[in-house]
Amino acid sequence: MALSALRSDSYVDLSQYRDQHFRGNRSDQESLLKQSCTLYVGNLSFYTTEEQIHELFSKSGDVKRIVMGLDKVKKTACGFCFVEYYTRADAEQAMRFINGTRLDDRIVRTDWDAGFKEGRQYGRGKSGGQVRDEYRQDYDAGRGGYGKVVQSF
């Protein structure tokens, strides 16, 4: 048991999160996640650019493509993106070394993604942004100010 803990790489292990909109069963999703070269990147500032993402993530390997998350109504950035690498090894490097780093005064959060599909770049909240931003009551300049619910009062 102690030896298995030594081989564990918690930065690369799959998290408990699973995409609720994944089309397929849980074992299919797990299998795709274990071989994926695509990362979900969250907690980004609404003002973080694709160029900044590329500059940071290319330090871990060759980036194949970046898909910025967009507000489905306004088509503006809404705090997440997908980063796809050519190899799993490069994606694992990013999971180890970029998760938890700071970009635009925000702590970047990375997780495995089963692979980008068209349409997933749009935020899932009611107004097209991220759900948690709609209910946020504090002021966050990197997220466009106050949450949308607070702004409506």
UniProtKB/Swiss-Prot annotation:
Its main location: nucleus. GO terms for cellular component: cytoplasm; nuclear cap binding complex; nucleoplasm; nucleus. It is found in: Nucleus; Cytoplasm. The keyword RNA-binding applies. MRNA binds at residues 17, 40, 109-113, 120-124, 130-131. InterPro entries: NCBP2, NCBP2_RRM, Nucleotide-bd_a/b_plait_sf, RBD_domain_sf, RRM_dom. PROSITE patterns: RRM. It comes from the Eukaryota. Residues 37-115 form the RRM domain. GO terms for biological process: mRNA cis splicing, via spliceosome; mRNA splicing, via spliceosome; mRNA transport; nuclear-transcribed mRNA catabolic process, nonsense-mediated decay; positive regulation of RNA export from nucleus; regulation of translational initiation; regulatory ncRNA-mediated gene silencing; RNA splicing. One of its GO terms (molecular function) is snRNA binding. Pfam families: RRM_1. Keywords: Cytoplasm, mRNA processing, mRNA splicing, mRNA transport, Nonsense-mediated mRNA decay, Nucleus, RNA-binding, RNA-mediated gene silencing, Translation regulation, Transport. Component of the cap-binding complex (CBC), which binds co-transcriptionally to the 5' cap of pre-mRNAs and is involved in various processes such as pre-mRNA splicing, translation regulation, nonsense-mediated mRNA decay, RNA-mediated gene silencing (RNAi) by microRNAs (miRNAs) and mRNA export. The CBC complex is involved in mRNA export from the nucleus, leading to the recruitment of the mRNA export machinery to the 5' end of mRNA and to mRNA export in a 5' to 3' direction through the nuclear pore. Component of the nuclear cap-binding complex (CBC), a heterodimer composed of ncbp1/cbp80 and ncbp2/cbp20 that interacts with m7GpppG-capped RNA. Belongs to the RRM NCBP2 family. This is Nuclear cap-binding protein subunit 2. It comes from Xenopus laevis. The lineage of its organism: Eukaryota, Metazoa, Chordata, Craniata, Vertebrata. The gene is ncbp2.
